[in-house]
């Protein structure tokens, strides 16, 4: 592993330094293939690989930047970056079908293909022993309905709406798993959640290495994001047999079959979110049916082994 000076935020000078470092690296190492990810780092890596004469360049899009910002100049910059880098990209992959269609429709890449995301079913699965162990450690009785969210603690994951919605879901606890990255910006979601007035029904669990066990101990998974690629956390929850309540946005709406494996709600609307959560908290039979259907869907579509094999095949490896 080689660390390079990459910045997630827009910073022309920082990006120029990163580009130079990448060109130097590629000219030194002479790779046969460069496979890039994410909007800014993916743009820089592909352009640097082209400049350095790397024979094969691939890219996996985890969500187009221009689809996620309402700022018109940023949308234009995001599209221009993808369009330019698309000219030098031999293999163009996306994690969602919708993004692949966007890439083809917007002339970013005529050959864009969705490979999806995947997780390991041997790690994420229903686990009665883990459920008992985690609930015992947290002092949560078996009959308590637990809603869990696993994500970075940032505003665009929908925490403001979730905090308000949970006030109207009195018969359930909310477990929040995750933390902020140093590079994350925006308000303090810990403070926002604590101020929601949920009292003992809120558990901020922070960063955990036992996410599979935490999911197995929960009853409902929620992810009210404003934008996503194809969230791994939803796949993990589905493999664990949890019904999923998510927002009707790119990514989750490909994963969740409304009424069959979970429920979709409009982004940014706490009332709809509360209604969906109440529908599930009050109906254990529905939770079990949706969870089982979601697990079957995840095993078919999001098994890590299948996703990796498809990716390697498309990369010619």
Question: What residue ranges belong to the model's regions?
Answer:
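A short, well-ordered alpha-helix in the C-terminal region of glycosyltransferases
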Residues: 49, 136, 279, 286-300, ...
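Glycosyltransferase donor-sugar binding loop
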Residues: 119, 150, 173-188
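A conserved mid-protein helix/loop that constitutes part of the nucleotide-sugar donor-binding site
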Residues: 145-168, 172, 187, 263, ...
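Nucleotide-activated donor-binding/catalytic signature segment of Leloir-type glycosyltransferases, i.e.
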Residues: 187-206
